[in-house]
């Protein structure tokens, strides 16, 4: 799984010479001084492709000590289905006869092995004409319930194949599969290809193959849970695309791209910002740019100043306005992009640390998501969001309409707070068991998810995708080098998603050649760069 947002992509610390600036003259917003929340029209910000007529029933396993995995799998699925329409998620054990006939399609998530499923559910799956997607375990329950499953569907499973699988072939592309994932993929005793279609194929290390996903009649079966150990080029993309067959079969093929300039703050080099904007504008490419408007370095790791507000950084303010004139869309990237309570996890400096969650680093460089900060409440998070908007206003900059969590890491309270002020986020996001309302939020199990298309997630927000990551010219801490060719390779894999994106971010302090190579490589694949404001 993608464990925690920081672990999912590379972080690059901001390191540059800082010059003294005038002391702040703006009084910070006092805690509790929250203005009325804005009125946000959720209907106006739903994904354009989303249809009110598309309703999906999500059924999941939830029993026992591993029940949290089923709740998370259902959350991930609900997020993806938020691209297409509405959904209802409930434990499979609570299914009542005839229920699936009220929905466009049904997805059953077999996260836990050996679950006994209601006969009413099995009988309805066997008799319905509506699309059913069955994922992972417990397919034997359905096979045994049918009088002659093989005769009806043309295939029959056998046992979990635990052979190392490095590739899943789908629509002519080779998608990656982590070879150390030993949970297994369901094997088959027989597949009659005259009656069953093999949609995707697992390739063992020795080159032999077996079906990864099959379809016959209205039933699609995927032989493993695709949310385990994912990456930007992973077989989860096949699942992301297969949802179209059930929920939007007439969707047209199109491939769009997004780019965002990242980690801008009051001590950024204005000339570097202008340089990146000039290149993108010269190519006719709209872009976003993420700004944290209050620079903090309470541990004094850099030369003075150790704090600087945006309105006291006239060169950066002018550069932000320049970016907007060149087609850039402002994104609020937190307030300070750090935490004053200590290293979180690195050095307490803006751009390096997490703002809305407690994170630590062990001696061997491993990152650990600890849990909510001591201050964590919806009101505390709202205060920081409003304080950032206050700082933009003091700088003569219109408040942004898109939010991005620093290092893509936050508590459930923080996500709820942001949803009160922003209809749209642009990021990868963290999710927890309990967000479906079936249990309290469980912070012991934090998992990240990124999307190949625009979704409406369980926090109630539209989420624009960031699914390629960023450029890292060299290894930093435990994070490996990542070059333009790696991002372009990921963009190529994402072409299997019929209405998917190639979305990445770029730190302007890096050499411009990296941005050029990435943009031009993505364009050569046929992607069209669009403005985040258009979504």
Predicted features, each with a name:
Residues 8-102, 253, 280, 289:
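Aromatic-Pro/Gly-enriched surface loop or interdomain linker
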Residues 108, 112-179:
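A glycine-rich, often tryptophan-bearing local segment used as a flexible ligand/cofactor-contacting loop or short
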Residues 201-256:
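Non-catalytic propeptide/linker segments at domain boundaries
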Residues 57, 140-141, 286-413, 468, ...:
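Metal-dependent polysaccharide deacetylase catalytic core of the NodB/CE4 family, i.e.
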Residues 368-455, 510-515:
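Catalytic domains of cell-wall/extracellular-matrix polysaccharide-remodeling enzymes
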Residues 89, 243-253, 271, 275-297, ...:
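C-terminal domain-boundary segment and adjacent tail
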Residues 256-266, 270, 379-402, 408, ...:
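Catalytic grooves of carbohydrate-active enzymes
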Residues 163-218, 224:
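Catalytic beta-strand/loop cores that center a nucleophilic Ser/Cys/Thr
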């Amino acid at each position: 799984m993608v464990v925690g947002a920081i672990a999912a992509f590379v972080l690059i610390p901001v390191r540059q010479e800082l010059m003294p600036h005038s002391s702040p003259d703006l009084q910070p917003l006092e805690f509790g001084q929250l203005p009325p929340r804005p009125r946000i029209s959720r209907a106006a910000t739903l994904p354009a492709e989303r249809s009110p007529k598309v309703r999906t029933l999500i059924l999941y396993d939830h029993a026992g000590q591993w029940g949290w995995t089923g709740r998370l799998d259902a959350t991930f699925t609900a997020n993806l289905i938020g691209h297409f329409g509405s959904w209802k998620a409930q434990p499979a054990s609570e299914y009542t006869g005839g229920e699936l006939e009220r929905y466009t399609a049904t997805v059953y998530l077999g996260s836990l092995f050996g679950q006994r499923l209601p006969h009413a559910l099995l009988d309805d799956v066997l008799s319905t004409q509506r699309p059913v997607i069955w994922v992972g375990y417990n397919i034997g329950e359905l096979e045994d319930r049918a009088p002659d499953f093989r005769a009806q569907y043309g295939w029959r499973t056998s046992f979990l194949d635990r052979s190392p699988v490095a590739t899943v072939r789908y629509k002519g592309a080779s998608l990656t599969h982590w070879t150390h994932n030993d949970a297994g993929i369901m094997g088959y005793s027989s597949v009659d290809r005259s009656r069953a279609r093999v949609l995707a194929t697992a390739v063992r290390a020795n080159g032999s193959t077996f079906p990864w996903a099959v379809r016959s009649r209205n039933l699609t079966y995927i032989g493993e849970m695709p949310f385990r150990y994912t990456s930007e080029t992973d077989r989860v993309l096949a699942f992301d695309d297969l949802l179209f067959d059930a929920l939007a079969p007439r969707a047209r093929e199109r491939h769009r791209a997004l780019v965002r300039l990242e980690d801008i703050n009051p001590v950024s080099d204005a000339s570097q910002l202008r340089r990146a904007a000039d290149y993108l504008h010269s190519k006719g490419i709209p872009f976003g740019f993420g700004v944290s408007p209050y620079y903090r370095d309470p541990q004094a790791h850099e030369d003075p100043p150790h704090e600087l507000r945006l309105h006291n950084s006239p060169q950066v303010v002018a550069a932000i306005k320049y970016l907007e004139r060149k087609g850039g869309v402002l994104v609020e990237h937190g307030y300070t992009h750090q935490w004053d309570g200590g290293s979180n996890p690195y050095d307490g400096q803006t751009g390096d640390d997490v703002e809305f969650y407690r994170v630590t680093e062990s001696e061997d460089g491993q990152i650990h998501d600890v849990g909510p900060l001591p201050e964590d409440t919806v009101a505390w998070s709202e205060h920081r969001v409003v304080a950032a908007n206050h700082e933009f206003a003091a700088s003569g900059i219109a408040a942004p309409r898109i939010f991005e969590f620093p290092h893509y890491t936050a508590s459930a309270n923080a996500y709820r707070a942001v949803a009160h002020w922003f209809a749209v986020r642009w990021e990868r996001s963290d999710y927890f068991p309990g967000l479906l309302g079936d249990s309290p939020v469980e912070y012991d199990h934090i998992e990240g998810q990124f999307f190949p298309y625009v979704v409406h997630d369980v926090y109630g927000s539209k989420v624009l995708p960031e699914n390629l990551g960023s450029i890292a010219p060299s290894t930093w801490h435990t994070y490996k080098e990542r070059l333009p060719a790696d991002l372009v390779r990921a963009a190529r894999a994402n072409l299997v998603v019929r209405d998917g994106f190639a979305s990445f971010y770029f730190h302007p302090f890096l050499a411009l050649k990296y941005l050029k190579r990435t943009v031009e490589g993505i364009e050569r694949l046929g992607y069209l760069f669009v403005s985040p404001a258009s979504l």
